Amino acid sequence: MSTPSAAPALLEVDDLTVRFGGLTAIEALSFRVHEKQIAALIGPNGAGKTTAFNAISRLVKPASGRIRMRGVDLLQRRASQISALGLTRTFQNLALWPGLTVLENVMVGAHHRGHQGFASATVRWGTAREERALREESFELLSRFGIADVAFQPCEGLPYGTLKRVELARALAGRPQLLMLDEPAAGLNHGEVVKLGELIMLVRQTTDVSVLLIEHHMRLVMSISDWVIALASGRKLVEGSPAEVQKDARLIEAYLGGADSHAAS
């Protein structure tokens, strides 16, 4: 079995347990995400992947365990403070503002770096100098992702694959240290999935951002990930390099043997 990256750990999850009433959704989960690493959480439906994401981003309260980012205890912080610590998360469903232009949506993504709150950021950006800097930086992100041609169009009515790229650009506009992507390939066709993989690799190659993703598209996961953590029924089955994990008998059994009956997702 391969050893994890020698780079420092950015995110440390230790003995994480999450319960909903009498149901244990995650039990004693531990893993690391290292600097400039692409890590993936995989597993059948009900494995606990999204619950783990929700715990890390402080949307659900764990029963026990510890979550640290660069040594900072995230469980001692409110959900509203998480982005300022360098953690940005996308969701399975798009969360763009349809009435704003593509460029404005990306500019909103950088709101926590300034002095404006999220709501006010959609109305006024601060000083003219701040707005100009945000606009230039956001347009550069759109250019990098190949969608600068729609920068001044409203998001409403744009193709779904384009909106996925807008969402990724907006997440990066906040200059995160850790980017958490929740099923980024959902709803994309084959060509769009290939492009998405190229964009995620581009992020790793051109920035210091680490990526943690949940994804069911195994070809994408195995082609871009440095490290894979496989879950089933709220527990960690195996972790390792993509080559090691995809041939592990425990993971094969989890997908084919009905280990997706657990209620977490």
Regions found by a protein language model. Give the residues of each.
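Glycine-rich phosphate-binding loops of nucleotide-dependent enzymes
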Residues: S2-S265
